[in-house]
């Protein structure tokens, strides 16, 4: 099969372009995929080519329902080397907000799914560009939320600043979604505001504490439950020790 038969219906999607990349949709062997290639002014620069290869290496093994999957890295006629991802047919959060179509149900789904994706990214020690409404897609078929660009750098350990920046981005996106959808959930508004508090304040320390807040489980309540459980165990052990016959 010739390259032209392998790749058909290649179309540029300028609204999805990124800082260093152009994004295309195409058919590969008849199957719809998306292509991500360096902008023409960067294609001959070895540093940018290395950056692209590094992004592929980092993202290839990621597997999460709220992150667009990478399938391959190969040369496409007329475009050069491309990162090939699953086709994501849908609308960006930015466009949904701008068109006034964001619903309360979508906002509640966003609050949970976006946090799940961020937690997964952090578990894999990935440092990335800030997540923005432009890089979040609601798929057209089932309305699933997916992040289309999570960055390309992987560290042995994330710093507290990396985690804080992720949660700040999460808070900003959630607050904009709440305002756009008219969602009046006091809990979601409180979570968004705490994520955006000035550094050094009482921000959430990690995604797990944010998750607890979303589910209405306060840290203090968890500590009380743990202490009560430990006290009960000590009492039970003491009772059994007292009941033991003395030889």
Task: Describe the function of each predicted region.
Residues 116-126:
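Protein kinase catalytic-loop region centered on the HRD/HxD motif
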Residues 92-102:
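AlphaC helix of the protein kinase catalytic domain
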Residues 77-92:
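Conserved short submotifs of the Hanks-type protein kinase catalytic core
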Residues 36-41:
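Conserved beta3-strand ATP-binding lysine motif
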